[in-house]
Amino acid sequence: MSRKKLLQKLAQGHLQNVAFGEFVNLVEGFGFKLLRTSGSHHIFGHPEILELVNLQEVEGQVKPYQIRQFLRLVEKYNINLEGK
């Protein structure tokens, strides 16, 4: 699924059964980079934002509350999807 399509799906509130790899691709599309992995925690940072994004993969999916946290962060800092 394209980044734009996934973002539209999430914005409509469809937060269940989101593939971890697809969501990581979306997070990276907003300019975040993987800083480190500690166990199941994947920590992403953005060069212009001090707050970090913590994602956990559970059975190949991302936790819905972490999707909500990320969407709030994008809105708070008015970050735009890069490229595609």
Regions found by a protein language model. Give the residues of each.
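A short, structured beta-strand/loop element
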Residues: 28-56
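Terminal, regulation- and interaction-focused segments at domain boundaries
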Residues: 2-18
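Polyanion-binding surface elements
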Residues: 13-31
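C-terminal structural segments of small proteins and small subunits
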Residues: 58-84
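Short, electropositive, low-hydrophobicity segments enriched in small/polar residues
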Residues: 17, 43, 64
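Glycine-/small-residue-rich active-site loops that bind phosphorylated ligands and cofactors
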Residues: 15, 50, 61-62
